[in-house]
Amino acid sequence: MTQTQTVLLYSDKAEIRDRMRLAVGTRPAPDLTLQFVDAASYRECISLVDTYELDLLLLDGEAQPAGGLGVARQLRDERDDCPPICVVIARAADRWLAAYSGADATLVHPLDPVTTGQTFAGLLQRTPAPS
């Protein structure tokens, strides 16, 4: 049975959100179908996290003025029910920052569709479906 999961894409740049959506695709695994909601600003991101039942957050670590690493850290500190977080970073050397932010996974620009799909499938399949 295929589950539909909701993923938040956060970046201040529409082209980055489009690249993230394209790399993930709508079916990262045979049993997963994704739908996306987009956030172009920090305020919109936080509002959508509060409004939607999200299954995964994909945050751009390079977003301005609030980067995905800071948003991830804030959500981890302030929410007990935070969904899994994947942060996209520009340099592999910054993985330690992503770990400190509380991100469950990191991806590095440019996004590889195979790695991105596998990462998403792993994060979503380990998360229990809402009852």
Model segments located where?
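Conserved phosphoryl-transfer motifs of two-component systems
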Residues: 56, 104-107, 113
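Conserved phosphotransfer microenvironments
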Residues: 55-75
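Conserved acidic segment of CheY-like receiver
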Residues: 4-25, 57
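Alpha4 helix (beta4-alpha4-beta5 surface) of REC/receiver domains from two-component response regulators
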Residues: 90-107
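Short hydrophobic/Thr-rich beta-strand motif most characteristic of the beta2 strand and flanking loop
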Residues: 32-40
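Acidic, metal-coordinating helix/loop segments flanking the phosphotransfer/catalytic sites
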Residues: 39-56
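His-Asp phosphorelay/catalytic-motif detector in bacterial-type signaling
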Residues: 79-84
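C-terminal output helix
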Residues: 111-120
